[in-house]
Structures are given as C-alpha cells and as structure tokens.
C-alpha cells in the first residue's frame, strides 16, 4: 500500500512539474521577427491592459458633395447598389508620372532606366540600360490596364473606381509645381483638375504629396502651398483635416523633408518664422517624412504637425520598421504631433534597382500587407497611409495586376487570388480600422 502511495505521489509530482513547465514555456514565447500570428480573416483582439483616456486630438473633416464640411470620419452613400463606405482616415499614395505613345508620344516611366549602383564594382555585376515597353516594363508586376498613360481619362476613372472599391477615402497625389517633374518624367501638374473631378465623382478627397525638386526651399514651398490652395482649395474634392485647435485646414505630406534643415522649415512653419504660414489663409497640417531616428527632433524643431513613414519595406529604415512605431507614436503624443504610419503590400524594386534585392519584401499572398496594417493599427493612429496605389517601380502597388509572360519576362502576379485582391484587403482593414476606432473612443 505504501509503495502504491509513493508511486501515486511521484506521478502527481511529475504531472505538476510538467504543467508548470508548459505554462512557463508558453509565457516566455515571443513573436518572431517575421509575420505576426494574425491569421487571414481574423479580427484584431482589443489591446489588453490599454484604455483610451480621452478622444484623439485630431478628427477628420471632409468636404461633402457641395463642398460643405462635416466632422464624420466616413461618408456612407448609395451608388446604384447597396450602401458602402469611404473612410477618410485611410490615405493612399498615388502617382501621375506614367505615359504611353498614344497619349504622350512616347512611354514615360514604364521605360525607366536600370539605375546603376554607386559602387562601380557592384554596378559592373548587374545589367544596364533601360526597359522596352510594352512587353518589358519597369516593374516586377504587370498592370491590368497595360503600360498606361496617366493622361488617359479612362485610366483616371478606372483608378478612382478601384480606390473607391478599396474604401480608401483620400488620394495623396504626388505633386510637382507647374513645369517641373522628376528626372525620369515630364510635368503633369496640369492633370490635377482631371484627377480631382474624377475623385469627386467617387466621393474621394485629394491631398497633396509635395515632392522634392531642384531648388526647393522654404520660400518656394510657401509659393507652392499658396498656389495649391488658391487653385484647388474651393474644389469639392479638396481634403481638409480638423486640427487639435479645432481649425479645419488642408493637409500636406512633405516627401524628403529632411533634405531641408529644421531651422529653415521653422521660418515657414512656426508662428515666429520670417514668412510663416501659421495663422494665414495658407496655413495647413504639414506632415514630414521620418527616415532616421534623429529626424523626430528635427521634425519637431521645424514646426511640422506630424510625421509619416512612407516606405513599405519593414526594416529598411528606422521610420519604416514596425517595431519602432510604438516609440515614435509615444514621441508624437508627448509633443502633440500626428503619427501617420504607412502600410504596404510588399516591396520589390529590382526591375529598376537590380542590386537592391536585400530590401525586397515578398507579399506572401497578402500576409505581409495584413501584418503591416495590423502593426499600423496597433499604435492607434488617427490616419493610416497606404504605400501605394500605383508605384509600380517599387512593387508597392495595390492596383489591379494580371499574369503576364513574354519572350524575355515572366511577371509576378497576385495568384492564387484575383487581380483585385489587395483592393479587397484594403477595404477589409479600412472597415476594421473604423470599428476599432469606435472602441477606442468609448
């Protein structure tokens, strides 16, 4: 009998140790550096142990069909079918730099050069030259519309319809001043009215993504802002945002803002600046690009209202690394700045930078995109930006793409999913973001 009792005690002790060890092992597990445990289709669980103490300082304001302002974050409307929503806290970067022979007399950007590496030894081991559309384009994917022209009204209409289907409420238009373009393109500022008209038709708003150009200074940006507001400020599609002070102001993203010293930006963006926009009819919400960690202080010192991350390659920079977003958001909250994380479906620019495969981020059938969106949402931002609708060179597009094989090229595609897979994922997460925000504000 004693022997049986001893065996029972030993068995009970071993079982207890097993349970204890299992619990400790589970407790010490950490997420991997790769994808999260979010399964496709699963909703985010509420953040445990975190409560929203107050409403956010910033609420979206959008112009209605007649240009009137209201403070809802979304607009629900019927368009010859069931009700659906557009969410003005989802902003998507959009490019107008493409051209085709039919509309522009030649291909523009689809025939992009293969950019050589700055180290001649590395450059020597990679191909040179430029792409030869329509079969060979400067992208690893192939658009359903083919190598199109951004001037084609049917293309613009198709794009706005796709963005509406994705439920993204704000197109962030890559913008250069009249007569100015990037080094591989041609001026396209004259297309802005057509984009705004098409966007308005689909209840989409338009914000401006100020691109760097030769000679860009605080003074030239002052003139750029004045031009944009004077020219487009009364359009029904012109996007405005309600600031923490209650003012309803245009919102501008400033790409490569770090190229200009913070003390120079301060002349434009602080109340005591020599040619300040603050308190004038040309005031706005100005969002700077954060790439390196030190840019946080520079952005604050420059008088900006917030920061965005843009790049869709997790780990490429301090700003684009998901693991840093919580700290960036905390800095922004402390200093009354907006933090606008940028989520993307993947990254692959080897069609234009053949030596840059170490920054490639595969899409994994949409898993990378959902992980990126989850990371953005987890820091409870006011706005999430999507990189991008149609930056085909860097493989960040969510625009419809199709399988394509030529004699020289085999393009990537969205299989096993349909061409609109990333539009559908965007809509799913836009809806989820709206529902999560409602919970945060309770």
UniProtKB/Swiss-Prot annotation:
Location in the cell: Golgi apparatus membrane
Pfam families: Glyco_hydro_99 (PF16317)
Keywords: Golgi apparatus, Hydrolase, Membrane, Signal-anchor, Transmembrane, Transmembrane helix
Gene Ontology CC, one term: Golgi membrane
Molecular-function GO terms, alphabetical: alpha-mannosidase activity
Enzyme class of the recorded protein, top EC level: hydrolase
Gene3D superfamilies according to UniProt: Glycosidases
Membrane spanning stretches: 9-29
Domain of life where this protein originates: Eukaryota
Membrane topology recorded in Swiss-Prot or TrEMBL: Single-pass type II membrane protein
The enzyme's E.C. designation: 3.2.1.-
UniProt keyword annotation of Transferase present: no
Cytoplasmic side: 1-8
Ranges facing Lumenal side: 30-442
Residue stretches in coiled coil: none
Family: Belongs to the glycosyl hydrolase 99 family.
Protein name listed in UniProt: Glycoprotein endo-alpha-1,2-mannosidase-like protein
Gene that produces this protein: maneal
